[in-house]
């Protein structure tokens, strides 16, 4: 089976470099793409779909030139091909209203403020990946090293 995919979208190269460093932990188990715009990410979405692969998580900045992260994640949420994809919004400038809009419009699963604490960020990604793998019925045994054990235990306990 092909590795699940994660897409990271941020217009700031230093943030993408930080994401690349922090997500290194997952690289053996998932393919990770780094995009500087929503347009670039949309091309990756089409490639993933054309190959019939899983898009597990999108990590996206909120404030970007052109299409905002909320707009982009809203479009992904409305795209039947990726409705089960987990969405994490990164932002350093969001107001309370922005956050509410992101939850309502884009159905984000997690929110991380910039700057973030590395351990907390990795745990959020780990939890989202775990939820996706379980919801899609992917054999989780291949991914045990990178999955969130508490989420895995809770979900498996509730299904038996």
For the regions a language model picked out, list residue spans one by one.
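Active-site residues of response regulator receiver
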Residues: 10, 61
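Two-component/phosphorelay signaling modules centered on CheY-like receiver
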Residues: 13-38
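Acidic, metal-coordinating helix/loop segments flanking the phosphotransfer/catalytic sites
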Residues: 20, 36-57
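Hydrophobic/aromatic residues positioned on beta-strands within the core alpha/beta folds
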Residues: 88-91
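Receiver (REC) domain active-site loop signature in two-component systems and cognate sites
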Residues: 64-65
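CheY-like receiver
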Residues: 120, 125, 130-160
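A Lys-centered signature of the CheY-like receiver
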Residues: 114
């Amino acid at each position: 089976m092909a590795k699940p995919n994660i897409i990271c979208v941020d217009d700031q190269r230093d943030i993408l470099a930080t994401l690349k460093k922090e997500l290194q932990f997952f690289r053996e188990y998932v393919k990770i793409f780094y995009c500087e715009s929503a347009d670039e990410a949309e091309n990756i979405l089409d490639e993933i779909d054309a190959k019939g692969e899983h898009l597990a998580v999108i990590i996206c900045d909120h404030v970007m030139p052109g299409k905002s992260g909320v707009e982009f994640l809203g479009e992904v949420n409305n795209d039947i091909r990726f409705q089960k994809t987990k969405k994490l919004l990164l932002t350093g400038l969001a107001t309370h209203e922005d956050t509410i809009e992101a939850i309502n419009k884009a159905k984000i699963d997690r929110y991380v403020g910039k700057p973030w604490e590395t351990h907390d960020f990795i745990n959020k990604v780990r939890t989202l990946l775990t939820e996706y793998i379980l919801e899609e019925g992917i054999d989780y045994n291949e991914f045990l090293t990178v999955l969130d054990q508490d989420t895995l235990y809770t979900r498996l306990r509730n299904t038996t």
